[in-house]
Each structure stands twice: as structure tokens, then as C-alpha cells.
Amino acid sequence: MFRQNLITSAILLMAPLAFSAQSLAESLTVEQRLELLEKALRETQSELKKYKDEEKKKYTPATVNRSVSTNDQGYAANPFPTSSAAKPDAVLVKNEEKNASETGSIYSSMTLKDFSKFVKDEIGFSYNGYYRSGWGTASHGSPKSWAIGSLGRFGNEYSGWFDLQLKQRVYNENGKRVDAVVMIDGNVGQQYSTGWFGDNAGGENFMQFSDMYVTTKGFLPFAPEADFWVGKHGAPKIEIQMLDWKTQRTDAAAGVGLENWKVGPGKIDIALVREDVDDYDRSLQNKQQINTHTIDLRYKDIPLWDKATLMVSGRYVTANESASEKDNQDNNGYYDWKDTWMFGTSLTQKFDKGGFNEFSFLVANNSIARNFGRYAGASPFTTFNGRYYGDHTGGTAVRLTSQGEAYIGDHFIVANAIVYSFGNNIYSYETGAHSDFESIRAVVRPAYIWDQYNQTGVELGYFTQQNKDANSNKFNESGYKTTLFHTFKVNTSMLTSRLEIRFYATYIKALENELDGFTFEDNKDAQFAVGAQAEIWW
């Protein structure tokens, strides 16, 4: 159409010239005729350029103008910038409505950020992830981590953990939505240059598919807004970030569940999952597979007062054992399976100036209670790396936790993680059956906020734990850690923002080691380490 308009314009412009040439042909010389033709051609080219420019402006998306700074003489301050051109603030997009041209412009303005989000939503694919990686060295050879779950993470972890999630929307019509989700996680070694998965001599390089499930909305008439999922997935995890373990964690081989179901003032999460375990005999040389199932139920986001919410949770794990498996437990020395449960509540308070604090109370029995008594990592597992063993006799354990962060004025922030635990008549990995324990661990991390991108601070950690075995013998484990750090950040929050690049110097000391006999290199009870670590999520 554009080319046809140009040709028509050219013919109309040439027509008067042709008529004039015919009427004056007899009185003009050849030179005069050529001069008139050249003049008409120049005028035609000028008109064509004018129409072309107008058409280009009409169909090219406009950008929002930016002001140009000038110097005292009125010239642009930097007419030839060395950096690349700045992005436009907005773009024009064409409206799809049929009557858009009648009501106004057929184009509307949209910021680049909104346009990018629109494209992602239209495609329906997202790629999210997390990883950490860094360099470190210590005063006596290779640096070692110790009691991260009690002393804190800064300057005390040398792993390269990662989580990568792929999510694709496959249907979104008529009030119904379907997404396919896959999560890959694992660890990449930070000691040797090679990191082949399966070459696991150092226990570092491994990978797994931790999630592979379908999640939907709109298929359940009684809960159209809830997320209904089926596949390899567990209930949502709740982490004490500074200690790198979870207060709520239900691992799953496969399951079915419902999340964010609005009931009354709050929301319900419920999951029924399978997690088979390896049941060992007393020599820890032979094992048998036992089929277990977990019901995890939570009532969350219950409003209490301004910026405060409550969650109530319960979890029960039972086994579906065969006759031969029970016979092995009765007659062949295999450990008896004992059902286990955990119940509790948590309160989250958000602050006016930013930050939050979360308080939780949990009580458990048998194998979950046993994991309350671990000082290195205390997530509420039913097993130890999938292995089930120990004489569980109905003992219980209690755990109180606090974690959060708070701003103090405009230039200070402090994060905390404090845990108090005790248990009676539990099975301990270190002191055996019928053990009692009591422990307290505390980590605080104050920092000075230079600006949005820089913080300088210290992380202080201390813990002490005492176990008492069936014969009333006492075993003590304790230590402390001091880490000086400077971080490059993209936001001021310590617990809810990443990227974070840390430069640190750490002194860590084991005061007592009667539970694990741990030592650093050269049988030292202390270690000084320096390093740099990057941690990011997206």
C-alpha cells in the first residue's frame, strides 16, 4: 500500500508537467525541456521523502523523550557519550480492541519493565534458582566447616549448593490453569577444579530431581483459588536462614497436596506424601525398604493484630509394613519402626520500618524428636540421610526458636537466630537410646549500612549442648565463632535480598567436643579463615 501511494503521488505530480510540455513543445528548445524535467524530478523526490518520513513516524513506536543537559554555553554536555545508548523509558504497543481507533489512539504506552513482564506472562515460562560459591583458606591447611547449624553460616561454609527450578504454564483458559514444575538441586565441589557428578570421592558433587510435579488452579469447586498439585513434591519448607536448617520440612518421593486454600480468616496447606526409608539391623550392615506415608497439615496466615500472623501445624508419619518386614524386626535384629509426629505453632510479626521476627514452638516424639537434638543441622527429618535406625521408646523433645531482622535508625540493621531445645528419653546418634539433652544456640549479626549496596558488620555465634545417656553420663559440646565481614548487596535486608558478595575473616573455636570429637587441621581446636563468597537467587 505504501508503494502504491508513492507511485500515485509521483504520477499526479508529473501530470501537469506532461500537459505543459505538450502545449509548449513547439516553443521550447531541447535544453529548456531538460531543465524543466530536472526541476520537476527534484520536486517529486522532495515530496516522496516528505511522505516517507511521515509514514515512518506513523508506524514506528515512539519513546519517551529524555532531557539533555547542557553546559554554560548551551551545548550538550556530552554530545558523543562513550557508553551505550540508554534504554527508552517506555514503548508504544498497538491496542488489540476493534474500536481503539474510534475512542483514541491505536497505540498505548507501556514501560519496558511491564512489557518484559507481559512477554514472560504470555510465554508462561519461568526459570528460578539459587546458588552459592566462593573461595576460602585457613590458618592450618584446608578450611573446615563446623556446627553451621549452631554457630551460623558466615565464614563457616565452603559448599557450592544450588537449586534450579523450571516452570512452564501449559494451560490457562476458562478459569483453569495448569503448570509443570521441575526442581533440580545438588552441590558442586569447591575444593578441586573438576566437578563431575558421580565422581564423589570427596563427598561433594551430586545432583537430584527434588521436585517434578503438576500444579493446577480452578479444578476443585470447593477451592478454586487453591494450588492443587500431584507428583514429586513436599509441603513448603520454613528455614532458619542463618543456621541453614528448617523448622518445617517434609521430604517426599511423591505425593498429592493442596496449598493456599482459603478457609475462614486463614489458609490451609495439606499434603499426603510417600517417603520410603531404609530400615537397618543392629550391625548397620543389612537393610530393608519400608514404605512410609506422611500427612502434613497447616493452617496459616491467621491475622492476629497489625502486621502479625499465626500458623498452626501438625505432621504424622506412619509405615505400611509387609509381613516379612515385621518378621525381620521381630526375629532378625532389624530396628522396629515407630510412628512419629510433630505439632507446633509460629507467630510472625512484621515491623513498620521493615524487617520481621518469627517465633515458633514445636514438640515431637521418636525419630523427629531425635533430630531436634542435633547441633550441626536440626531439620525435623524422620531418618538420617534416608537411614532409619535406633531404639525409639516414645521420648519427646521441645524446641523454641526466634529468627528475624530489625532496622535500628537509618544506618544499622541486626539479624538474629536463637534456639532453645530439650528432650527426654530419645534416641541420640551420639549417646544412644534413653538419652536426655538440652541445648541453646544463638547467632546475632549487626551491621552498619553505608548505602543500598554496602554493609560492614560482624556475625557472633555461640552454642552449648549437654547429652546425658541411659547411665546418667554427661557429654558436652560447645563453641563460638566471630566473623568480620563486608558485603556488596542490592538491597539493605540481610535475610530477604540477594545478590550478596561477602568478604570475611573468621575465628572459630571448639570449646568442648565430647559428642563428636571434632578437630580442625593438625588436631587444632581453633581455626582462622579468610575468604569471599557469592550467594544469589533469582
From Swiss-Prot:
Residues 1-25 form the signal peptide. GO terms for molecular function: carbohydrate transmembrane transporter activity; porin activity. It is found in: Cell outer membrane. It comes from the Bacteria. InterPro entries: G_neg_Bact_CarbUptk_Porin, LamB-type_porin_N_dom, Porin_LamB, Porin_LamB_sf. The keyword Membrane applies. Keywords: Cell outer membrane, Ion transport, Membrane, Porin, Signal, Transmembrane, Transmembrane beta strand, Transport. GO terms for cellular component: cell outer membrane; pore complex. This is Putative outer membrane porin BglH. It comes from Shigella flexneri. The gene is bglH.
